[in-house]
UniProtKB/Swiss-Prot annotation:
Annotated positions of the Phosphothreonine modification: T196
A Pfam family of this chain: HSP70
Keyword Membrane recorded: no
Residue span of region Disordered: 592-639
PANTHER family, sorted: HEAT SHOCK PROTEIN 70KDA
InterPro entries cross-referenced by the UniProt entry: ATPase_NBD, Chaperone_DnaK, Heat_shock_70_CS, HSP70_C_sf, HSP70_peptide-bd_sf, Hsp_70_fam
Skewed-composition ranges (Low complexity): 601-613
Top-level taxon in the UniProt lineage: Bacteria
Database matches in Gene3D superfamilies: 1.20.1270.10, 3.30.420.40, Actin, Chain A, domain 4, Substrate Binding Domain Of DNAk, Chain A, domain 1
Protein's UniProt name: Chaperone protein DnaK
Amino acid sequence: MGKIIGIDLGTTNSCVAVMQGTQPTVIENSEGNRTTPSMVAVTKTGDRLVGQAAKRQAITNPKNTVFSIKRFMGRKYDEVPNEKKLASYDVINEGGEARVKINDKIYSPQEVSAMILQKMKQTAEDFLGEKVTEAVITVPAYFNDAQRQATKDAGRIAGLDVKRIINEPTAAALAYGLDKKMSSEKVAVFDLGGGTFDISILELGDGVFEVKSTDGDTHLGGDDFDQKIIDYLADEFKKQEGIDLRNDAIALQRLKEAAEKAKVELSSRTDTEINLPFITATQEGPKHLVINLTRAKFEAMCADLFEKILEPCHRAVKNSKLDMKEIDEVVLVGGSTRIPKVQTLVKEFFGKEPNRSVNPDEVVAIGAAIQGGVLKGDVTDVLLLDVSPLSLGIETLGGVMTRLIEANTTIPTRKQEVFSTAADSQTSVEVHVLQGERPMASDNKTLGRFHLGDIPPAPRGVPQIEVTFDIDSNGILSVSAKDKATGKEQTIRIEASGKLNDAEIEKMKQDAKEHAAEDQKKKEEIDIRNSADSLIFSTEKQLTELGDKIPADKKPRLEGSLEKLKEAYKNGTAESIKSAMDDLNKEWSDIASSLYQTPDAGAPGASGPSAGGEPETGKKGGDGEVQNAEYEVIDGNDK
C-alpha cells in the first residue's frame, strides 16, 4: 500500500505534504515552490496549464484563466453573485448550477478543482517515486454538506480515493499540536485564507484533539481585500481619465495582480506605489496608472471586512463555553493573517499576542498529511474529534426547521426523532432536509428531499415516522425515514441537486486521465527537443574544435546528419527528431573509433557528444573512466 498524501486545496494556493517516518514533509512542485497557485488555464492552441504556468499567462489570457474556483464549489448560480463579479472568466448558469466557461467549453467547479488536485498528485508522485491513489483533502470548517461532497467528487475525478475530508483549522491544530501530546491547552485557530474565513476553538491534551466549536464565513477572504483595492484603483483612474478599467478584461487582470502585490507590500510597509504603464490607450495616446496607496487608506476602505471577521469569533467563543482567558494560544493560519490590521484585531479580541510559530501557507497541508498518517497507522496516539459546523434538521408543519443535530456536535454522530403526519389519511410524507441556523426552513440551505410512501391511512398525528440523521467522519450526511407501523424504510445519502452523479464523475475521470497522458507525452517531447538542441550545440562545437582531425570521408556524412537533425528540430515530430539524433550519434560513434586510433587526437566520447550537455573528451582507461592527462611537448633539440 502506498502513502496517503495530505492536500490543502486552497482558494489562492494549494499545498501537498506526506509523512516521512514520523515527520510530515511539504513537497516542492516541479518549479521548486512549496505552494502551487490554484489556477487553471486553457491556451488558444488548446493546451491546459495548471499552477504557476497558468498564472504567468493570466494577464494576456484573462477570459480563459480560472482562479478562486473553490468559491464556486457545491454552490448554486444564484448563491454566488459577488464571486461572479470578481471573476475575469465567464460564470454561467447551467440548470441552476454555477459552471465556468473556458475556451468555449463548460466545466463544473469540481472538474477545475480536479485539475489542481491532479497537479498536487503528480507533485507527490514525482517526489515519492511511486503511484499515489489515496489522499486526505482539507476544506473550510464552515463548508456545508454540498461543498464537502463537491470536494470529494473533485478528488475522485483526479483519480484519488479521498480517505477523509478534514476541516482546515483542525488540520492546522494537528500540525501545531503533534509535538505537544503530553501538554494540555486550549487553542483558537484563526484561519483567514484567500476565499474563506474559519475560527475553531480546540482542546488539546494527551494526543486528543477535540474541537469545542467552529464558526466562519465562506464569503470572506483575501480575494475580498484585493477587490477593495481593485475598485479603489479603478475609481481613481476613472476620476483622472474618465475611463473605467473594469470594462477591459486585460486591464482588469493587471489591476488584480497589482492589487494583490500592493496588499502584500502593505504588510511590511506603510505605503506603496502602484505603477501600471500603458494600462490603456485613447486617441490621445497611451495612458498610465500611477497611484500611491497607504496602509491607513487600505485599512479604512476594508473596515467593513475587518468588522465581519469579528462576528464569527464572538460566536465561536460563546459556543465553546469557554471564557476568553481560558484560551491559551491563538494560532494564525492562512496568508491573509499576515495583514497587520488582522493581527491587531486578533490581539485585541483575544487579549494576547497571536502565535506565529507555524507557517500559515503550509500548516494545513501538514495537518492533512498527519491525518493521512493516522489513517495509515503510521501516526499513533492521536485522536481527532471534530464537529459539524452547522445545524441539521427537517422542515415541519408551518415551514419551521426542526433541528435534529445542533451545530458544533462532535462527529461522527447519529440522532433519531419521531415525527407524524400533518393531515388525516396522509399516505406519504416528504422529508425536506435542511442545514443552517435560521428558524424558518426557507431561510436555510436545502440539502435534499425524499419521499416515504405507503403509509397506512390513519388520523393525523397517529402514524409514527422515525427520522434518523447520520454524519460520518467527513461531515457528510445520510438520512433515513422509517414507518414504525409497517417497518418500511427509505434511506438516502444526501446529495445536493448539483452533485455530480457516478456516470458524470467517471466521464470526468476518463477526461482527466487522457489529459494526464497528453501532459506526459508533451513533457517527453520537450525532453527530446532539449536533448536534440544540446546535441546540435555539442556537435557544432566539436566540428570547430576537431576540424581536420575528423576523417575526410566521414565528415560529409556527419554534417549531413547534423543538418537532418536541425531540420527535424525545426519542423519535425518527436519521432523524427529522435530518429535524426540516433543517426547523428551513430556517425559520431563511427568517427570516435577512427579518432581513437590517432594518438594525438582528442576524440569525442564513444557514443558521440553528450546529448545532455558538453561533449566528453579524453581517453578511456581500463576501468571505463575517462582519464585526462597533462602532457608537455618536448623539442628534440632540447635533449
